[in-house]
Amino acid sequence: MMKTSAIHFPFQAPNTISLVAGTGDAKNPLNAFDMALLSSGIGNLNLIRISSIMPPKAEIIPLPKIPQGSLVPTAYGYEISKIKGETVAAGISVAIPKDKELCGLIMEYECVGSKKECEDTVREMAKDGFEMRGWEIDEIISIASEQTVENIGCAFAAAALWYK
């Protein structure tokens, strides 16, 4: 019989989270997305897309100086449109539990619509996620962006996790 052992991962849970948002408008979708990343402050990082869990006790801070090219765990949403005059939006929220031993929830949402509509929706999503778990919310923090399309427009919002 084969002996089993615990798997050890070289990763530690990040202990900070930064909410960022940006917009871009360019001649093609990828450059619009890249411009939105740059305007949010994380355009020179390698984003590793994660699901929507904030590690317990992680601290929400302004975006720190992260070395270019770093692999950064990130939950994000974005909306791209080619329709001139259309407004696109993206938002992200973080719900922090009253019980600090529990994880927080990160919710992302994108839409054709306004920044306000998007941010309201993403905050409701955070409330719903806590309700499904039977947890009490201490605080919800959110950010959103909107872009009215000229060429090809992109709205972007993210929660970048990092280490203190």
Swiss-Prot record:
<protein>
    <recommendedName>
        <fullName>Pyruvoyl-dependent arginine decarboxylase</fullName>
        <ecNumber>4.1.1.19</ecNumber>
    </recommendedName>
</protein>
<dbReference type="GO" id="GO:0008792">
    <property type="term" value="F:arginine decarboxylase activity"/>
</dbReference>
<keyword id="KW-0456">Lyase</keyword>
<dbReference type="InterPro" id="IPR002724">
    <property type="entry name" value="Pyruvoyl-dep_arg_deCO2ase"/>
</dbReference>
<dbReference type="InterPro" id="IPR016105">
    <property type="entry name" value="Pyr-dep_his/arg-deCO2ase_sand"/>
</dbReference>
<feature type="site" description="Cleavage (non-hydrolytic)">
    <location>
        <begin position="51"/>
        <end position="52"/>
    </location>
</feature>
<comment type="similarity">
    <text>Belongs to the PdaD family.</text>
</comment>
<dbReference type="GO" id="GO:0006527">
    <property type="term" value="P:arginine catabolic process"/>
</dbReference>
<dbReference type="InterPro" id="IPR016104">
    <property type="entry name" value="Pyr-dep_his/arg-deCO2ase"/>
</dbReference>
<feature type="modified residue" description="Pyruvic acid (Ser)">
    <location>
        <position position="52"/>
    </location>
</feature>
<dbReference type="Pfam" id="PF01862">
    <property type="entry name" value="PvlArgDC"/>
</dbReference>
<keyword id="KW-0670">Pyruvate</keyword>
<keyword id="KW-0210">Decarboxylase</keyword>
